[in-house]
Structure formats: structure tokens, C-alpha cells
Amino acid sequence: MTSETSTLPHAMRGEANPAAMAALAIMAIAAATLAGAWFFQLVLEILPCPMCLEQRYAYYFAVPFAALLAFVAAKGAPRSLVLAGLAILALAALGNAVFGAYHAGVEWGLWKGPTDCTGTGFNPGSAGSLLDNLDKVKIIRCDEVQFRFLGISLAGYNALISLLMAAIAAWGMAKTSRR
């Protein structure tokens, strides 16, 4: 390899770029997960609880952030910047995995969930307002499973998918730090 080609970004030298590959994989997984969540909600009419909606935030963050990271990694951004971006994705995914596991534990009754979505903090107000609101509000409880596949709820799958995304980010970090 000549000194001229060694200064080019890895992609321009025909080499694989693990950071860009990891970021693109995370972006694709996050986008597919969001598409699945919206499919369940809009087509199958499996409505999300408040905790389910909050778990989507990590995916909403990951799609554009991972796309931007893949772009700058492919363009030869400084290694420290790319590693920091992958670390941010890994931490966001790990945090979401913990949140998903917590939610799955609430569904299994292992611990109590937030009172605003588990039905334990119900305040009926007056009898008249209660009757007026009964037909208007559909409360989706966080401690009731809306859908299971192979015995795992959507919150459980969120934890597993988030762990996969964190592992991909860690792989990208390990490969990038060795370059």
C-alpha cells in the first residue's frame, strides 16, 4: 500500500468499515422494529400501553443517529468520534433493554409498575364524570400483556432486540478500535 492510499478513508480503499456496517445494521433493526410496532398498532389494533410508547423513543433516536454515524464513518470521520457515536448507540440500546426487561417484569407480576398505567392509581372523581368518561377512554394497562409470541411479550422482545443492537454497537466499537 502506498502512502497516498493509506490516507484515504477505509471505504475508498475497498476495505470494510465495521463502524459503518454496525451503524447501518442498528439503523435497519431500529427501523424494522418501529415498522413492526406501528403494524401491530394500526393494522392488528394491538394498542400500546404508556410504557410501550416510551420504549419506542430509543428506536426513534437510533434510526437517524445511526444513519448519520454510518455516513460520517464511511467518510472517514476521526476514530474517536465514531467510537463515541457507537458508545452512545450501545448505551441507548442497553438502557432500552433494561426498560423492556422492567416492563416484562411488570407484565409477569414480578414487581409493581408505574401507578399511572397499572391500574393501581385509579381516581374515579365524581360518579357523573366517571360515567361520562367510561365510553371515551380506552386505558391500556402496562401490567397486562397485549400479545405474546412463543411465551414472550412485546416488552420482552424489545429487551432482546435492544440487547442485539447493543451487541452490534459493541462489535463495531471493538473492530473500529483495532483499526
Whereabouts are the PLM-identified features?
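Loop-to-helix transition at the N-terminal end of transmembrane alpha-helices
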Residues: 46-61
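Structural signal for the C-terminal ends of transmembrane alpha-helices
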Residues: 68-76, 170-177
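Extracytosolic (periplasmic/ER-lumenal) interhelical loops and adjacent juxtamembrane/interface segments
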Residues: 108-153
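Hydrophobic residues within membrane-embedded alpha-helical segments of Major Facilitator Superfamily
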Residues: 26-33, 40, 65, 69, ...
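Interfacial segments of alpha-helical transmembrane regions
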Residues: 17-27, 75-97, 167
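C-terminal TM-helix exit segments that contain a strictly Trp-centered aromatic cap at the helix terminus
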Residues: 32-41, 94-110
